[in-house]
């Protein structure tokens, strides 16, 4: 309890300082797409740049553009059909945790369903992801008994105010085609100082695992462009 995204951001900054880095870059997808910008907001003097492949951006104060409206309509449908997991993790993480820590099959299903729903895999998940890599991902939660604490971040986020100021630290935004939370560039630019924008040809929510070479190249290109 109490391990909010803000606290995680401060912990990660502290780790970098302990390692001797006065200035560093951060990258984030999924929850990292939330926490990486928080590190820059809370410690802007230390962060040279932020690269994200998950960004919901900020809505327009006026009428949304056609692209923004299409995204918002999609998100309304998507949230209704695909975010039940989020609501239970936000409201009852401890209750859910008892079930998932007691059943390896239940934990496997809970996690792999998201790989299926959110990735760019066609109709064969194992053409995109190595089976061993997926099992390793699940086992990290199982062997360490941490699925409950991982779920609690959803609840902790709701207890803290969300940032409203535009982030002025340089940001690189990679908009992958099968990322459900990939907001249009215009929305992201309202929230962040986007100095590099890219649309990789393939990839989804788990871009670093799905397309590691494309992902690494995009991240490296962004940071190499910074002064």
Residue ranges and their predicted role:
Residues 8, 15, 66-93, 163-166, ...:
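The feature captures the conserved acid-bearing segment of alpha/beta-hydrolase catalytic domains
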Residues 18-19, 28-29, 33, 208-214:
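Acyl activation and transfer enzymes in specialized metabolism, enriched
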Residues 21-70:
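Conserved hydrolase catalytic core segment
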Residues 89-227:
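C-terminal subdomain of alpha/beta-hydrolase-fold enzymes, centered on the catalytic histidine
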